[in-house]
Amino acid sequence: MEKNKTGKYFKYAIGEIVLVMIGILLALQVNTWNENKKSNIKFNKLLVNVFNDLKIDLEIAQSRIDFYKYKDSLANDIINGKLSVSDYKNNPRRNSMIFGYWGFRVSNMGYNALMQNTENIPSEYEQLIVDLNRQYIVTAERMEISLTVFASIVKSARTRYALNFPWYSQNDSVSNEKRWQHLANNPIYKNEARLYRRYGVRNFSGFVAGFYNQGLPLLLTLKAIINDTNPLPSFFPKNADGFDSVKSDYLGKYLTPNGDELIVNEIKGYLSIYIDHIGDFNDIPPMLLSMISKDKFKNHRTGRTLSFIRDESNKVIGWSDGTDTVKKIDVND
């Protein structure tokens, strides 16, 4: 009798212990779920801020690109002696060619806040962090250095003209005539325009274009992660009509002449190309494509037009960008 009672009590105690352990484990699991949920909510909020900053930055970058395209055209006209006194007289905007610049510094508050909360970043988004670091550290810092050099050249030109040419700071008819004569006929001014074009139009604006083109697929990635349903901003490249009906034709793996494998995939209604990287991370940013017409796409990182190639059965078998021909290696039967 006593042995039976002891056995029952022992089994009961073991059962109680098991129930307590299960309760503790469930409580820990629930706590982990809650903590993960809080972390994911915070991470999403941080990404929303990064997304909004990048959207603004890309819009500003686009405006700078357009501005320096005009400056490039103007510099070429000056260097080639195509502008007369009357050209300067009739368009005052031309008078300030080498004396002004339009800078650009990125809005990195959202990015910095994200980097200060790395404990909230899920492991599956490590590649995203690599891409953001490239955008906001490598590319943005190169752009900043280039802007510093460019700004110093412009400020030096302003100082030199202010000290040597009285008409520079005057706006009367006599001073204006001297200004126009100098800009139209002085050979040194042409050299100054060359310097401006090199460090401003060709250098600084080149880094701005790199930031913009690299940021386009990154913006789409962020948009997908935060599940943003708003229309893309107006500056974003547009696909030609009919994209949805043919986009699946282009998806898949491709092989370059030097042996690199490329993957064309779709993200938020656009095609992008990235290298099929073996390892933890891909250090080469993806390239956004926008459709010009059926089988023709603009590569927004290189500026080239990709022409997809089809076989007799109308299947896509590769593409050419005018320099290289890339072969599709997963053509379905």
Model feature map: region roles:
Residues N230-D333:
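Peripheral terminal and inter-domain segments
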Residues M1-K11, T32-G242, E266:
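Long, hydrophobic alpha-helical segments that serve as membrane-spanning/inserting helices
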Residues I14-Q29:
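Hydrophobic membrane-insertion alpha-helices, especially the h-region
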Residues Y12-I14, H300:
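A generic fold-level signal
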